[in-house]
A protein has these predicted regions:
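P-loop NTP-binding core
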Residues: 1-255
Length: 255
């Protein structure tokens, strides 16, 4: 299973959702890998506790090998790092990814990530791909490489406006590059059940026939606190309601 967590809008919780679902997967015994493709490296920091120059090499190292071409490029494999959490491994992002993007685009390396995931298939049962908040080279590579796509969504008008174009972009990519990509659904994040607007917006999306998932992720300060200590919720506060929502969401997606 290769799941990409994607939304071209920033601030909707892509990294939090990718990392926490990956952590639940690993806690349930699946050999799990998270690949961070965002130069901001939020997922890398969350799962390793490291930032900036302290982050070990990862996807940037891999793509530099790819750009060399020849035998070295064909055998390229990124450094894979253990995390403090059993069964959960990480390929980090660093700021260097942003500098590599135009070179990778110029050399048409858009399918290299899919080949890498093919080579990792025997090592990992579950692979999660965290993407940048833009439809750029790394995001398209992830959508081509994945077989499932999860779309985080905040209940506000800006997110809703962006959602329609996002779904159109995914459909076009499916037709052109990856017919095997399945949109699993829209996961509502930062949900406030007592507020009228979020529930109204969810109902309107459902009425339009959009695939809104039945498990919503509540807004909670515990998420920000888990970021602060670099510990996914399943390890930081396993009994918290938001943690249990992640467990429920993971179970729904696995069913």
């Amino acid at each position: 299973m290769r799941r990409v967590v994607f939304n071209q809008k920033g601030g909707v919780g892509k990294s939090s959702i990718a990392c926490n679902l990956a952590a639940v997967s690993a806690a349930q015994g699946y050999r799990t890998l998270l690949i961070d493709l965002d130069a901001q490296a939020n997922s890398s920091h969350y799962l390793s506790g490291l930032t900036g120059d302290a982050l070990p090499t990862g996807m940037a190292d891999y793509f530099k090998q790819v750009l060399t071409g020849g035998a070295a490029g064909k055998k390229a494999r990124p450094p894979i790092h253990e995390t403090p959490f059993e069964n959960l491994h990480l390929i980090t992002a660093t700021a260097e990814l942003a500098d590599l993007q135009p070179k990778l685009e110029a050399k048409h390396k858009i399918n290299k990530l899919r080949k890498l995931l093919d080579n990792l298939a025997e090592d990992y049962e579950r692979i999660y791909l965290d993407t940048p908040p833009a439809l750029n080279f790394f995001t398209v590579s992830a959508l081509i490489a994945a077989d499932r796509c999860l779309i985080p969504f905040d209940c506000d008008s800006f997110s809703r406006q962006a959602l329609y174009s996002l779904l159109d972009e995914i459909e076009e990519l499916q037709e052109d590059h990856n017919e095997g990509l399945t949109v699993e659904g829209i996961v509502v994040n930062q949900f406030q059940p007592r507020a009228a607007l979020p529930l109204q917006m969810v109902n309107e999306l459902l009425a339009e026939g959009l695939p809104v998932l039945p498990v919503h992720l509540m807004s909670s300060v515990r998420m920000r606190e888990s970021h602060q200590v670099c510990m996914p919720l399943i390890h930081f506060d396993p009994r918290h309601k938001l943690t249990q929502q992640f467990v429920e969401l993971h179970g729904y997606l696995e069913s």
